Regions:
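Alpha-helical recognition segments enriched in aromatics with Gly/Pro capping
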Residues: 1-34, 45, 49, 99, ...
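Short, well-structured beta-strand/strand-turn elements
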Residues: 63, 133-139, 453-455
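The substrate-binding groove and active-site-proximal loops of carbohydrate-active enzymes
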Residues: 80-86, 110-116, 228
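Structural preference for alpha-helix termini/caps and helix-kink/transition segments
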Residues: 274-466
Length: 466
């Protein structure tokens, strides 16, 4: 079955084929580093991670660029309030973002690029738009004349034909009711940063940043552009208007947008004050892999309602997966192989692949895994799961985890948590019972390396921290 994605541009599920052989050129709108990202933001980046991993599992090579917006209105305000330069201020939250994605096991794109390191590229893009008649100047700032781009609105599927010519908007974020000519280059104001350029001293608008950086690294036409659904308009609409006005070619072939994460039926956002950061949840004792599981478990085009019960359920699901893998590694199975079980494993793997091929349907993919675990646990309980079927079962579980990446407990910089120590001790006990002394010794050594000393007694295993 072919790989298919819902394309926001066409509003249809389409078969995916990259423009050039098996290399996928992909761009992701990264964070605006004016504060810590919240888990609603991280839902989008988790979707992008699942997408990356599945494209690679399907044999594609990736050339993936993510930007970091490190100059814009909120950053300037917040840096001034903190009495810091924008470089000092954004360095804090850029570092925090990179730490957060590492904690959630999100793969880094091949390139992460900062807006302030590409000012010359943005100036060049604005100049090309000037040459082609898509701009005008007002009060020293350069604006994009959207009336000169007849297909404006084709991504968000809004009709902007009635917009009053010459009406302008200076802020980077606005809704469709305020759609107007948008700023490409903002003339410097007192107390704000600015860069000298042939188009005047100033700074780039948000939208030109992504157009310039995407085309610099990925060319005139991208295979995939991802982001949150809230970026469809105006940001991605404006990216199309800018880029296609410069090149005369389609900017992006497949637009993929992740839906909102909501809390109490409201979109989670900093402006509403109804958000949690990853650090908030870790501080409450939730494991990063449980947070990752929750964010990945609902298909990206469906809204995800955040609840702490959902995090607890995610942790329970991960325990079930880990216990199953432990059973496969430590139980003593009868000799031989079962043809029906071999076919059941192949069917489960096929269902898993088909679900992710179908616009990354993570819910169906997870269902295929847990149905398989249920069926094979039943066979194991009855003594009807031969040793010859174990390798294929482990291979299927590993394929699942190559995408979802939740089975390995998180490494803690302050040592293992008590629950993690107890889980490893339970695994060691099961390994010893199965006479797998090699694994038993490995676990003892692993715990010792983490400062945990074991003592085997008649009453069971005791442990202490060194």
């Amino acid at each position: 079955m072919s790989l298919r994605f819902y394309n926001t541009l066409s509003q249809q599920v389409e078969e995916f084929t990259p423009l050039h052989d098996n290399v996928v050129r992909m761009y992701t709108c990264g964070p605006t580093v004016y504060n810590y990202v919240h888990i609603g933001n991280l839902r989008t980046f988790t979707f992008q991670d699942i997408l990356r991993r599945w494209l690679r599992a399907r044999g594609y090579q990736l050339d993936h660029v993510m930007n970091i917006t490190d100059v814009e209105d909120k950053i300037i305000r917040n840096a001034k309030a903190a009495n810091q330069t924008i470089q000092e201020y954004t360095a804090i939250y850029t570092k925090a973002f990179l730490e957060d994605i590492a904690t959630l096991r999100l793969e880094r794109p091949e390139r992460i690029v900062l807006a302030t390191e590409h000012i010359a590229d943005m100036v060049s893009a604005v100049q090309k738009l000037e040459e082609r008649g898509f701009t005008y100047v007002s009060d020293g700032s350069v604006y994009y004349r959207i009336s000169n781009f007849p297909s404006y609105g084709k991504l968000s599927h809004n009709d902007f034909s009635g917009i009053r010519a010459g009406a302008r908007v200076d802020v980077d974020e606005y809704d469709k009711a305020d759609a107007r000519d948008f700023v490409l280059w903002k003339a410097q104001k007192d107390g704000e940063p600015g860069w000298d350029s042939p188009i005047g001293k100033g700074r780039p608008g948000w939208h030109i940043e992504c157009s310039a950086m995407a085309m610099k690294y990925l060319g005139e036409t991208l295979d995939i552009h991802t982001g949150g659904v809230d970026l469809t308009f105006p940001h991605h609409e404006n990216e199309i208007a800018q880029s296609e006005a410069i090149t005369g070619k389609p900017f992006v072939r497949y637009w993929l947008h992740a839906e909102h994460l909501s809390i109490d039926a409201q979109k989670m956002s900093k402006s509403a004050g109804n958000f949690y950061t990853l650090r908030d949840l870790l501080g409450m004792g939730y494991a990063p892999e449980a947070i990752r599981y929750l964010l990945a478990s609902v298909p990206y085009r469906k809204k995800l309602s955040f609840a702490f019960d959902g995090l607890k359920a995610a942790a329970t699901s991960i325990d079930r997966l880990r216990n199953y893998k432990l059973r496969l590694k430590t139980d003593k199975f009868p000799d031989g192989a079962n043809t029906a079980l071999s076919e059941r494993t192949r069917a489960a793997a096929s269902a898993f692949d088909a679900a992710l091929d179908d616009d990354l349907n993570t819910a169906e993919a997870l269902a295929s895994v847990f149905e398989y675990i249920r069926d094979t646990n039943t066979a194991m309980d009855a003594g009807g799961f031969p040793a010859g079927n174990v390798p294929a079962a482990l291979e299927f579980l590993n394929r699942f985890d190559s995408v979802f990446d939740v089975l390995k407990p998180a490494t803690r910089t302050d040592g293992l948590a008590d629950t993690e120590v107890n889980a490893l001790i339970a695994e060691r006990t099961a390994a010893k019972k199965a006479r797998n002394f090699t694994r038993s010794d490995e676990i003892r050594a692993e715990l010792a390396a983490q400062g945990v000393i074991l003592e085997d007694t008649k009453e069971g295993v005791r442990w202490k921290r060194s």
